[in-house]
């Protein structure tokens, strides 16, 4: 089984900054649910998708059948991501791909054998799929 883990807060932060805004992770953002919906489109058999967000669980959050979402509460989402990568790699021998622009998080996850895709490459790949109407981006394929 393959697991794709997204640093959701990092991805959203970069989108907000590209629009000249600063996100507030203490409050719900429409971009959170949009990211989950987008990822559920690319789910393939044998691939698990997890998205991690900083901050408290959202009271209006709806569970998605294809994408598992985690909120860090008072902890850092980065630490939860690293713990998950370590567990999946060491205990289950799973292939893990991390999507983040955070260099320190990338390095921490690589120590457990995770593949890394930068947020910039993630968006570029997604836009190419949308533009050329391909079925799924390379990072989602087994």
Regions found by a protein language model. Name each.
Residues 2-4, 10-142:
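Nuclease catalytic cores that cleave nucleic-acid phosphodiester bonds
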């Amino acid at each position: 089984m393959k697991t794709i883990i997204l640093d959701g807060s990092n991805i959203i932060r970069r989108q907000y900054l590209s629009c000249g805004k600063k996100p507030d992770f203490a409050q719900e953002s429409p971009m959170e649910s949009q990211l989950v919906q987008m990822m559920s489109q690319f789910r393939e058999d044998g691939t698990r998708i997890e998205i991690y967000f900083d901050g408290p669980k959202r009271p209006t959050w709806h569970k998605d059948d294809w994408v598992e979402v985690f909120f860090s509460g008072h902890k850092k989402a980065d630490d939860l991501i690293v713990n998950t990568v370590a567990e999946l790699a060491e205990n289950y021998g799973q292939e893990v791909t991390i999507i983040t622009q955070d260099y320190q998080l990338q390095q921490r996850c690589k120590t457990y054998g995770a593949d890394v895709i930068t947020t910039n490459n993630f968006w570029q790949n997604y836009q190419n799929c949308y533009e050329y109407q391909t079925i799924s981006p390379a990072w989602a394929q087994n």
